């Protein structure tokens, strides 16, 4: 078995190396020919068992608490025959794709006790926790060479784990910490060295803490763990289940911890977890996202990390060829080290795929792992894999000739990621340029609006974006604003500059890793030149340089660091003066600062100095100005942050420059001039410039960066064509289109491209509905459920409106993705064919509506009805999903043309209410349901009318129960799905007796109306509490208010105004409605602000038009307009969003603009 595994691994790696070097796909061909190899490599069966066990635990906790363990285990065994991974692990990739297509179909299994099941066409099924996917939610799987933690083993033998503080951790931790199911794969510095492998009996006695640490450090600057401790890790993993009775006393003491046992303590219940590394990791994973170690051969790792990554790729991508290790001039050394790099990338890729699920987003970081995407795609082509390069991408001109062996595979490897993010436009432009030169068959397109390059090469497409990394502002501000830090900063200034420094004395501060890319040597040369050119600054200015030592095991680093330290000593000796005996021109320290101390130094400084030769971003400049907005800044063009600041207009060629730019760090004279300009800059100007930088950084923090990168423009979830037989099929399908439409709306609003699968999903849904219609009609005849017999009256739905909305959405996506700047106008014009009169009438009404909206310019408040106003009536309320185009138009109107927006409807809030059918993201609109008697502001802010007595609600509940019983009778059962059906609102009940198409016979309407009146009379004979109101489409049962009146939308508006402390007496108000139930809303606004109200009514009823006109004129208001259909209103709103307005978009929805 062992020899077979070794042969398999050797074969797979050989094919991987061949594919990487040649761009072929031999590995994928092997998996297709012998699928068992892939299943074995990825541990498919183990993963299947783990997920089924997870599901078993979940089912037992929520629905099987009263059942026996035997029954639960039977359930696991049964599901094991048809589990998801069993289906995924089919004989080839083509079959796996078939499964992914099948898994989107759903039905209700009566035997599942109401549990939603996924159904496969061959009859196999597996339980699910929701309608559209499994109970496993989408996770972010973060993959990096270095871990987000530091590890330390105490002398007692116990391990200590602490959260890391490096740049990568700061960038990614906010998004990772959101979900504890997120996973971080990294190398902990513990790897396999076969030459040093010990027997497991010897490993139990490893207590020597004097063994030397590994010579290299990881990318966070943390030392790699020694080999002996790596062996302990493997021993723990392998022998965790050793029975205590088989251990000797010494071994047992090691497992329990010497101190506790020798002191007479009680052995812990889980002794390994007291001291083993595995136990520490398990404990960490219980309270954080999951941290999984990636273990590789130590010899490979040392060459991969300390060799080719830092000796070749690091200096090459920084365009510092003079620091490339000379050993790589030897083709043999280059090949051997390249093979090690591929092997480590191969192991990372396998671990990532093993730990991933189909819905996960896998995020790979930095130059150590540039081949993982290519290898992972060969294992599973459906994965969504993103890559972010934290360093520059500026290889030298000879990179593709002298180092051809690795240069071309790196280019091909990066193009196999779904999305690649660069720090700056400079880096991306270089990559695109090199693609055009060295991969001539690649097709490159550019979306100017989105600023996204898409490269298609060898059948794969990759999006290239620019995502400047930032910092988590709150973490630094919290420290900077503390009294202790402020006092510490004052102490630092006094210690360095003296108790009474001269007014012109300046403290310059710089902090970075002791790396040749940071330009420390050039900085020291310029600082010496500064005093030579400006001797008047001697005795006044001090440069405080922190250069944190790392990578001293690498010769180039050690020599560079020693040279800089000597230069620092020379400067202090050269410029020492008797006139200022306590003055020291340069403070040079090589140990790091804790965050509190670092921030205190930021507060103490007058000028920050950030002048790398080349850097991906360099967050130090941002940290400095967030903490100390009154400080000056000397910044080199080698920093990615300088490029970002320049593009933001903070250092224009002609105009006010917010920092002092060093164009060439090798030009000591100009560099010294930048020092001088910063030192003598007036404090007022310096503070003004720092404030502008501060505002920019505050508006572009790390959460915006991670959100922008992780927001996908693609999805592997597609709605397939399906057969619609019963109501559940129909409503389930419509709810799934709601989810797709929500994604479309969110992506359009955020400016993320709409990928083809959204259109495919909507097109497939439309085709499914058309196929289900009666021949030659747009009418569905559906069984109430599959359990009903053939004699049951089917539900009849005229779905003409639903089909039209799908067509509009498909047109909308075509227009919105076009490059034509007039695509919005083109889409508005496409709506004219849906006008009930004519296209000319549509255009006239849009123009008239536009005049009203333009006159108002910007609305302080926007109150509107939904059904009949913003959307045409549907065949039933569960099917009245808001189209994507409508959601975008309404959200854009709320963002650009109004401040406080609210949708007020008579529908309930939830349980097939307005929130269930809306596609607008949270934050754009408030939702007032039940005529405004219950409000949803955001998930943390909901409120209701508190004036309803509890006994009245109980009375209404009795009415609801009685009507529900009535609808169980065969004669009235079809009213369940007529129109909005039976709905329980907060404060009233609605039962539809007619649909929008008048398809219910009049005698049936009269019959159910009489039955309902009989129920009301029986429960409330004197109608002291209840009041019945009939409309054309429904009958409503209201609870009377304290005054005896029915709660209406006008009172709903007043409830909102009172609760949210709105002042509607000032400013402008837009009110939209379509029926008499909306009139109280208009009247309430007119009473509060007669001249500021503008109103739009979607109606063709002359009677309603007269009522609206008279109501407005009674208040001296002439700002009203009538349109014939919701498409006109939406067209006018869309037109309003693309015109110039005089008032910007403030308020809580500003966050959407930043996104």
Swiss-Prot record:
The keyword rRNA-binding is annotated on this UniProt entry: no
Family per record: In the N-terminal section; belongs to the glycosyltransferase 20 family. In the C-terminal section; belongs to the gob-1 trehalose phosphatase family.
Keywords: Glycosyltransferase, Transferase
Xref: InterPro entries: Glyco_trans_20, HAD-like_sf, HAD_sf, T6PP_C, T6PP_helical
Species name: Aphelenchoides avenae (Mycophagous nematode worm)
Chain spans, region Disordered: 56-94
Low complexity: bias regions: 63-72
Its job: Catalyzes the production of trehalose from glucose-6-phosphate and UDP-alpha-D-glucose in a 2 step process.
GO annotation, biological process: trehalose biosynthetic process
Catalytic reactions on record: D-glucose 6-phosphate + UDP-alpha-D-glucose = alpha,alpha-trehalose 6-phosphate + UDP + H(+)
Protein name: Alpha,alpha-trehalose-phosphate synthase [UDP-forming] 1
Signal sequence interval, chain numbering: none
Domain of life the protein comes from: Eukaryota
UniProt keyword annotation of Ubl conjugation present: no
GO cellular component terms attached to this protein's record: cytosol
Enzyme category, top tier: transferase
EC number: 2.4.1.15
GO MF: alpha,alpha-trehalose-phosphate synthase (UDP-forming) activity; trehalose-phosphatase activity
């Amino acid at each position: 078995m062992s020899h077979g595994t070794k042969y398999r691994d050797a074969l797979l790696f050989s094919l991987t190396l061949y594919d990487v070097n040649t761009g072929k796909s031999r590995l994928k061909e092997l998996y297709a020919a012998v699928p068992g190899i892939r299943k074995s490599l990825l541990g498919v069966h183990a993963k299947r068992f783990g997920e089924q066990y997870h599901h078993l635990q979940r089912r037992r906790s929520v629905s099987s608490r009263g059942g026996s363990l035997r029954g639960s285990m039977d359930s696991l065994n049964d599901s094991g025959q048809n589990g998801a991974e069993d289906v995924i692990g089919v004989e080839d990739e083509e079959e796996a794709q078939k499964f992914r297509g099948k898994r989107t179909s759903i039905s209700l299994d009566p035997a599942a006790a109401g549990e939603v099941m996924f159904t496969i066409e061959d009859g196999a099924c597996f339980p699910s926790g929701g309608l559209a996917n499994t109970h496993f939610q989408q996770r972010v799987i973060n993959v990096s060479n270095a871990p987000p933690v530091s590890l330390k083993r105490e002398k007692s033998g116990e391990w200590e784990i602490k959260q890391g503080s490096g740049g990568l951790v700061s960038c990614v931790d906010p998004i990772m910490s959101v979900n504890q199911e997120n996973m971080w794969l990294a190398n902990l510095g513990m790897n396999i060295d076969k030459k040093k492998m010990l027997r497991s009996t010897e490993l139990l006695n490893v207590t020597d803490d004097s063994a030397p640490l590994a010579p290299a450090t990881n990318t966070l600057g943390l030392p790699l763990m020694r080999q002996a401790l790596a062996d302990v890790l493997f021993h723990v993993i392998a022998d965790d289940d050793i029975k205590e009775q088989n251990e000797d006393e010494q071994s047992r003491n090691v497992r329990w911890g010497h101190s506790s046992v020798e002191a007479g303590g009680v052995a812990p219940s889980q002794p390994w977890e007291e001291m083993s590394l595995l136990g520490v990791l398990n404990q960490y994973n219980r309270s954080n996202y999951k941290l999984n170690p990636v273990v590789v051969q130590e010899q490979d790792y040392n060459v991969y990390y300390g060799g080719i990554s830092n000796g070749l790729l690091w200096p090459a991508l920084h365009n510092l060829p003079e620091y490339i290790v000379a050993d790589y001039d030897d083709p043999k050394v280059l090949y051997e080290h390249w093979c090690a790099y591929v092997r480590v990338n191969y192991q990372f890729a396998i671990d990532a795929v093993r730990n991933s699920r189909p819905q996960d987003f896998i995020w790979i970081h930095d130059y150590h792992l540039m081949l993982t995407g290519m290898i992972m795609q060969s294992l599973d082509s459906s994965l969504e894999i993103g890559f972010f390069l934290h360093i520059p991408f500026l290889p030298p001109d000879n990179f593709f000739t002298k180092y051809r062996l690795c240069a071309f595979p790196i280019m091909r490897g990066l193009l196999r990621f779904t999305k690649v993010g660069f720090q700056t436009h400079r880096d991306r432009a270089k990559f695109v340029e090199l693609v055009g030169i060295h991969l001539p068959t690649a097709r490159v397109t550019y979306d100017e609006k989105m600023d996204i390059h898409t490269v298609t090469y060898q059948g794969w497409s990759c999006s290239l974006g620019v995502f400047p990394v930032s910092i988590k502002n709150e973490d630094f501000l919290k420290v900077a604003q503390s009294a202790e830090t402020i006092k510490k900063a004052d102490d630092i200034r006094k210690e360095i500059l003296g108790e009474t420094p001269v007014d012109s004395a300046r403290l310059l501060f710089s902090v970075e890793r002791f790396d040749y890319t940071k330009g420390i040597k050039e900085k020291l040369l310029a600082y010496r030149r500064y005093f030579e050119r400006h001797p008047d600054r001697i005795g006044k200015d001090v440069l405080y340089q922190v250069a944190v030592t790392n990578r001293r095991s690498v010769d180039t680093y050690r020599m560079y660091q020693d040279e800089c330290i000597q230069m620092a000593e020379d400067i202090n000796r050269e410029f020492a003066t008797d006139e200022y005996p306590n003055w020291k021109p340069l403070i040079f320290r090589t140990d790091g600062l804790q965050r509190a101390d670092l921030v205190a130094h930021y507060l103490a400084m007058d000028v920050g100095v950030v002048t790398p030769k080349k850097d991906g971003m360099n967050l130090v400049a941002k940290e400095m100005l967030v903490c100390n907005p009154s400080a000056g800044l000397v910044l080199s063009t080698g920093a990615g942050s300088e490029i970002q600041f320049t593009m933001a207009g903070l250092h224009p060629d002609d105009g006010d420059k917010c920092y002092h730019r060093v164009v060439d760090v090798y030009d000591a004279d100009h560099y010294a001039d930048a020092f001088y300009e910063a030192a003598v800059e007036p404090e007022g100007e310096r503070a003004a410039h720092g404030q502008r930088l501060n505002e920019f950084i505050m508006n572009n923090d790390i959460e915006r960066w991670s959100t922008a990168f992780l927001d996908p423009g693609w999805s592997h979830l597609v709605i397939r064509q399906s057969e619609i037989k019963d109501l559940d099929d129909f409503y389930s399908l419509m709810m799934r289109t709601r989810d797709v439409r929500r994604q479309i709306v969110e992506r359009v609003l955020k400016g993320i491209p709409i990928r083809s699968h959204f259109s495919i999903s909507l097109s497939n849904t439309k085709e499914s509905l058309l196929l289900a219609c009666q021949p030659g009609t747009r009418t569905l005849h559906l069984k109430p459920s599959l359990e009903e017999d053939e004699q049951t009256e089917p539900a009849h739905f005229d779905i003409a409106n639903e089909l039209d909305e799908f067509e509009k959405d498909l047109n909308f996506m075509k227009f919105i993705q076009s490059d034509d700047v007039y695509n919005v106008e083109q889409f508005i014009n496409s709506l004219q064919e849906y006008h009930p009169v004519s296209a000319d009438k549509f255009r006239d009404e849009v123009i008239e509506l536009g005049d009203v909206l333009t006159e108002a310019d910007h609305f302080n408040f926007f109150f509107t009805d939904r059904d009949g106003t913003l959307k045409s009536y549907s065949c039933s309320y569960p099917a009245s999903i808001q189209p994507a185009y409508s959601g975008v138009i309404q959200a854009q109107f709320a963002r650009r043309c109004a401040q406080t927006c609210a949708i007020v409807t008579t529908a309930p809030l939830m349980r097939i209410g307005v929130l269930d059918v809306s596609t607008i993201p949270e934050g754009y609109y408030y939702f007032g349901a039940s005529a405004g008697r219950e409000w949803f502001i955001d998930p943390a802010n909901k409120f209701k009318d508190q004036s309803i007595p509890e006994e009245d609600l109980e009375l209404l509940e009795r009415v609801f129960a009685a009507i529900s019983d009535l609808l169980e009778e065969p004669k009235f059962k079809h009213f369940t799905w007529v129109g909005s059906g039976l709905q329980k609102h907060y404060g009233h009940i609605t039962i539809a007796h007619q649909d929008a198409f008048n398809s219910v016979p009049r005698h049936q309407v009269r019959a159910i109306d009489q039955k309902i009146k009989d129920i009301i009379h029986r429960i409330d004979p004197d109608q002291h509490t209840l009041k019945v109101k009939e409309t054309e489409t429904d009958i409503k049962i209201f609870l009377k208010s304290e005054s005896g009146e029915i709660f209406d939308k006008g009172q709903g508006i007043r409830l909102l105004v009172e609760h949210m402390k709105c002042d509607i007496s000032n400013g402008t108000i837009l009110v939209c409605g379509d029926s008499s139930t909306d009139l109280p809303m208009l009247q309430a606004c007119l009473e509060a602000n007669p001249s500021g109200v503008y109103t739009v009514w979607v109606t063709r009823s002359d009677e309603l038009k007269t009522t609206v006109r008279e109501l407005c004129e009674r208040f001296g208001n002439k700002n009203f307009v009538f349109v014939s259909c919701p498409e006109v209103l939406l067209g006018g709103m869309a037109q309003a969003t693309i015109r110039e307005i005089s008032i910007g978009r403030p308020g809580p929805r500003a966050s959407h603009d930043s996104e």
